[in-house]
Amino acid sequence: MDTVSRQLFEKAQAVIPGGVNSPVRACHNVDSQPLFIAEAHGCHLTDVDGRQYIDFVLSWGPMILGHDEPSVTRAVCDAAHRGTSYGAPCPDEVLLAEAVVAAMPSLEMVRMVNSGTEATMSALRLARAATRRDKVLKFVGCYHGHADPFLAAAGSGLATFSIPGTPGVPAAVVADTLLAPYNDLEAVKECFARHGESIAAIIVEPVAANMGLVLPKPGFLEGLRAICDQYESLLIFDEVITGFRAAFGGAQARFKVDPDLTTFGKIIGGGLPVGAFGGKRRYMELIAPRGGVYQAGTLSGNPLAMAAGLATLGILRKADYDGLENRTRAFAYSMRDIIAAKGVPLQMPTLASMFCPYFSEHEVTDFADAQKCDQKLFTSFYKQMRAQGIYLAPSGYETGMVSFAHTDEDFNRALDAARKVMF
């Protein structure tokens, strides 16, 4: 059927590579075409054809308050009237930095950037400078943006030197990137036994939300902290997704493990482009202009994103996170039971306001497990839910999101749609 979305997608492909500005939006993984969105309010999207959807993607995480939250929208409009970019410091960037530092247990200082990729790239540079070492250990399936050192694919063995994961990344760039399976502390110990004196940092999603939703096993994060302490390496938490979502104080507050450095994005910008990295003062003061580690950005700390982030955190500081988690869990488990009643095996892990439908008989504890899930079943589920006005992430490797704007009526409509799905 010809639609305005389809027409726009055809036009877009003539001037934008693949017709989208981020690959997952193309919906190739689910044998579909993208929806072009005209507007969004609360937890509802309206596409350019006038169809409405209940949104469980939430712009991949930032919109925890829902779309067009009045206080946030007003803050952005007020900021825009004062000027959209100064190329100089503004008051809100100080206030937002203070708010982030106050919320996160491990932070003493924070630097604003423009994206999660910039944040992780800068944090790695800082860790290498602080330790005077070059290697970094990451986990297979964890995503830390598209900077070259993180675009690595696993070689053979549990923990090994990596090979490039995409054309255009020289082998030399990822030669210092080591990989291990997520949740495998023994593999990390083995890697450090071989290379520990050369490893600047471990970088990890404390909750792996880019292979679906994989929770850390008990003791895993604590074990990483102990290993880093033993070898005098830095522990970097990538909290671009979990920051202000796993808890107001992020995953580090929830699991009571303090990293040396933390990266942020998504929620701290209230829906505008933003990133940040922060940590202990002794490391952060190595950054220029105080120290010699260079990092800069024309739009870093831009007034619109700072205003949106400040308004968002102001609301979240008083928000009922426990209530949102309980509602998310009840919704996700109800959906799991509905699908299971159809004779289809489904795992549905949840944490805070995140959930993920894995079509598998087995618990998913790492990326290898996630890859074994039935993607054909997921594709069928996605397409049938979308046809009924339920917008889920168009990939089995992405987490679902719930906002404070979702109501019982929204959950019930989604569950009714799940009941009508045929496998």
Swiss-Prot record:
One of its GO terms (molecular function) is glutamate-1-semialdehyde 2,1-aminomutase activity. Keywords: Cytoplasm, Isomerase, Porphyrin biosynthesis, Pyridoxal phosphate. Pathway: Porphyrin-containing compound metabolism; protoporphyrin-IX biosynthesis; 5-aminolevulinate from L-glutamyl-tRNA(Glu): step 2/2. Its EC number is 5.4.3.8. Gene3D superfamilies: Aspartate Aminotransferase, domain 1, Type I PLP-dependent aspartate aminotransferase-like (Major domain). It is found in: Cytoplasm. GO terms for cellular component: cytoplasm. PANTHER family: GLUTAMATE-1-SEMIALDEHYDE 2,1-AMINOMUTASE, GLUTAMATE-1-SEMIALDEHYDE 2,1-AMINOMUTASE 1, CHLOROPLASTIC-RELATED. Homodimer. Belongs to the class-III pyridoxal-phosphate-dependent aminotransferase family. HemL subfamily. This is Glutamate-1-semialdehyde 2,1-aminomutase.
